[in-house]
């Protein structure tokens, strides 16, 4: 083996450093420099596309997937027969990028050719079939590379389900089969397909927040949250574990990823917890549990907030606002367990956690100010992409202001995290690295989403839950929780949420709203405007709407309402204050449980 081959092999064996300028002693090859340049340009393309360029969703989403296909092909090698091949990975990634561009160029021609002939079949050329098939294969392969075999298996089953398998299944799972050309068209071009609404969420919102998170990390956000957590919680009983919980909560505001959260805070907090007296397994468990909470922590929420906003048409700012209490409840519950463990094993009151005041100030400038700017814009109703872009610009500006202040006062801590060109490039690369998994999964799940919507199995699944629960909210939640548990064993949080939202949300929303409405009917709490809706129902119990009725009468009245009337009545009968009451009840219970006198 030649010396040149020996020098290249270690670089290819660990390709994570391909998306970082870093401090490597091994010089980068020209291929790596081209790859880095492409990733940086691709990051700026996302900013420009969402702020300056107005193109169709198909165009934007296809280019989005094409670029991340190239990045994923290199960072996540195929490992054919246990070996890596850079040539194969790059070739496959470039072929997928070509296929995505071919779809963009062929869309108008496909529509025109189909309209010019009689019949219902889509007019695909041989290259159309090849490009479409390659995109589906890419969705299967890239999702396998980044998350394992569960999602690829679901994609394969979804395609087979609407192609031929659905007509042979019994009950609510039975559906008519579709011809191959129809399956290909719906998978590629439909709003629920590969380049549909889920891909739009990824290309328009999530990727920009990933880039913003990269800027925060490079500017020293991880160090800041650790230092701040030490100041706030470091000197109480079990303080090291509370530092882990608080730092993970703060890091969750910018990462939304359990893996990234653990990697950035766990290397510090786990040794800290072990040295203060916690068992090693417990320390690792606290860090894992606290880091997982990043999926619940606004404003990013592991892409969940963007998916909710798109599916429900509720403003993103509203979803973020109402998510604060459940997120705090989650971290409060983890802290509650930490408190019990600290008392049980007599962990000390804390350890020496001396921090530098200037480090706290420097971190606050580049963490709190940009994050506050982003939250302000989100609450103002602007698009999430604009809010993230504005926060990036403010972060760069603030870092230079801090550097100037440091130069003037001679404070070294204020000068260390200035966002110069090298740091900006590294921030873009880190954002692109973090965005690979989300982008690949959001696009790939479009195949599953298309099969669910096309076949109508979502309605059948919701009907099945409603029948099994017999209108009981508790049973319905247990069934959905069981489904969530099973999906969570093999799917990332965002993927599991999307599938559950499509399959189970209609049933849960219907049972919850019916429970609240029946309660109001029993006690006669409907106002005249709401009561007028029930006067449209041909039922002997309609006259009792204002005065109250029995449980059986209320259930009979509600079940006799036509579907269209029920859909109109539900939003009128359920006030926001009622839902907020449900949200506030659980935290009060946990606050009560957190008192030592109530658990000992």
Predicted regions and their residues:
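Conserved, well-structured core domains of diverse proteins
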Residues: 1-123, 129-133
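Membrane-water interface regions at transmembrane-helix termini and the short interhelical loops
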Residues: 49-53, 75-84, 133-149, 310-317, ...
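Flexible hinge motifs at transmembrane-helix junctions and intramembrane kinks/re-entrant loops
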Residues: 140-161, 165-176, 197-198, 219-223, ...
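Hydrophobic transmembrane alpha-helices that form the pore/transport pathway of multi-pass ion
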Residues: 226-294, 300, 304, 313, ...
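Hydrophobic packing positions in regular secondary-structure scaffolds
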Residues: 509, 514-600
